[in-house]
Amino acid sequence: MSIASVASVFKGEHAVGSTVTVRGWVRTRRDSKAGISFLAVYDGSCFNPIQGVVPSSLENYDNEVLKLTAGCSVIVTGEIVESPGAGQAYELQVTHVEVTGWVEDPDTYPMAAKRHSIEHLRELAHLRPRTNIIGAVARVRNCLSQAIHRFYHENGFVWVSTPLITASDCEGAGEMFRVSTLDMENLPRTSDGKVDYDKDFFGKEAFLTVSGQLNGETYACALSKIYTFGPTFRAENSNTSRHLAEFWMVEPEVAFATLSDIASLAEGMLKYAFDAVLAERMDDLQFFAQHVDKTVIERLQSFVSSDFAQVDYTDAVEILQKCGREFEFPVSWGIDLSSEHERYLAEEHFKAPVVVKNYPKDIKAFYMRLNEDGKTVAAMDVLAPGIGEIIGGSQREERLDVLDMRLEEMDLNKEDYWWYRDLRRYGTVPHAGFGLGFERLVSYVTGVSNIRDVIPFPRAPRTANF
């Protein structure tokens, strides 16, 4: 008995006439007056289910096959034949059906054939992978993550596992989840009435990380080229389609690199990942183009064939001020560009992905390298047509005196960053890196606009089920 995935059958990896066994779940059952049933069986290996043609001569045809409904799990054995119908190249002439799991009450099964709204599916996150849309998102997400790992491996990067529990605030934003084992009903107090974190598990305040960057820099300053790829956390009370409390970040860090170097790295990585999806997951992309966003395939093809534009923040502000468009948020030098500004630049002005660089220092983090003008830092955002900002990065401040000045300006205690400052004391080196919000990337590739639908179990304000 040869076990086959549905994808391997459709790819022609098994000869016509050979017998294979497919294990999966029933999507639909259709019965013919000619005494045969058609089972659509999917196993998640590709978008389309395979059709099994089941004759009534099977001994369990009446008492089992005719009772199969959407969601039942089955093991189906049959001969691969060329399909006479349109839509798929092969089907199975079934010789054996084993039912491994029934759906208790088909009338109340939440994932029955009828279509559900994407909002309703969020309430059923444990079952939604069974739907066409979430299954397709999962395969594209996997393809993108595998491609990103391949890209960095092929380019000589070392993958570093940075800690999820930290004592430092990388962004200086303060919106962090506290990690504590203290009894909330009976908190220990210091003499001045504050919570005594000396009595806590780590002997100090600890938080879930907002970024692996600072830890990543320590390894880049020894191994030259590293990247992190893992979960990060923001206790930002934003209930929007663009925010999650827990999400994944890709963060490369490169020693002896400038802002220009990492802009090129970002372009190379994105194009590599998009090429992989176009090559490997066209079945899923066709579904998204048909049911979610008709431009997804064309958008990715255009992205990989376009050269990235580059513009200084100061020039971008001037472009926005002179374009004649009335924005919801007025543009002036010193503001952080909003999504409408970013999308205008990428979609209407440059009509290509664009790198905006050299932002005002007052709207950027303490670790970004101060430029010679004393007003801007060597920071960049990569803006993509259709979504806006997809990557944010910078050259890091490698000069200890300037770093200390920036920490002071932002009211951050330099003693908390003693180990980060050590990197500047012992063989300091220019270095640079960026962060890619992985869910935002998946959203861009699939056209699925709400970021809560591109991560298996979304975590957001008042949302931590499953």
UniProtKB/Swiss-Prot annotation:
HAMAP family: Asn_tRNA_synth
Upper lineage: Bacteria, Pseudomonadati, Pseudomonadota, Gammaproteobacteria, Alteromonadales
PROSITE patterns found in the cross-reference section: AA_TRNA_LIGASE_II
Coiled-coil regions listed in the entry: none
GO-annotated cellular components: cytoplasm
Record organism: Shewanella sp. (strain MR-7)
Catalysis: reaction(s): tRNA(Asn) + L-asparagine + ATP = L-asparaginyl-tRNA(Asn) + AMP + diphosphate + H(+)
Pfam families per record: tRNA-synt_2, tRNA_anti-codon
Gene: asnS
Family membership: Belongs to the class-II aminoacyl-tRNA synthetase family.
Main localisation: cytoplasm
GO biological process: asparaginyl-tRNA aminoacylation
Keyword Membrane on entry: no
UniProt-annotated location(s): Cytoplasm
Enzyme class: ligase
SUPFAM superfamilies in the record: Class II aaRS and biotin synthetases, Nucleic acid-binding proteins
GO MF, any single term: asparagine-tRNA ligase activity
Name under which the protein is recorded: Asparagine--tRNA ligase
Keyword list, A-Z: Aminoacyl-tRNA synthetase, ATP-binding, Cytoplasm, Ligase, Nucleotide-binding, Protein biosynthesis
E.C. numbers: 6.1.1.22
Complex and partners: Homodimer.
